[in-house]
A protein has these predicted regions:
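Short aromatic-glycine motifs in intrinsically disordered, low-complexity regions
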Residues: 32-42
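Acidic, Ser/Thr- and proline-rich intrinsically disordered linker/docking segments
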Residues: 3, 34, 45-99
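Short, mixed charged/polar active-site loops
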Residues: 21-23, 41-45, 72
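Short amphipathic alpha-helical segments, especially helix-boundary/capping motifs
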Residues: 6-9, 39-40, 63-64
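A short, compositionally biased micro-patch
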Residues: 28-29, 38, 68
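Anionic N-terminal interaction surfaces
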Residues: 1-27, 83-94
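Short histidine-centered beta-strand/loop micro-motifs
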Residues: 17-19, 37, 56
Length: 99
């Protein structure tokens, strides 16, 4: 198994208005974004080209908003990891374009 391009654990994953997990995992691997529960069960996944992500004006520096398969998720993680997630998602999408 290849090493993921990005992986963050302990992520709070919310689908408005409820929290799905407080200790989930966000993983970018093989051109796909996967949102996982703390037990490793998949919440949602999609090819990185189909994912929209960014920072919302109302979210703090530790949060990102991602739209996966038409569903908006709020991902709260350490501030440095949040920026790293957005950058890794952009890089992965660029890598898919080059292949």
């Amino acid at each position: 198994m290849a090493k993921p391009e990005f992986s963050a654990r302990g992520v709070r994953i919310e689908r408005w208005p409820r929290s799905l997990t407080r200790a989930g995992e966000v993983r970018i691997e093989d051109g796909r974004l996967a949102l996982l529960t703390s037990y490793g069960r998949e919440i949602d996944s999609a090819p990185v080209k189909a994912v929209r992500a960014g920072r919302s004006w109302f979210a703090g520096p530790d949060a990102a908003v991602a739209t996966v398969n038409g569903t908006r998720y709020r991902l709260t993680m350490e501030p440095a990891r949040s920026g790293g997630f957005l950058e890794a998602l952009r890089r992965a999408a660029d890598d898919v374009d080059q292949d």
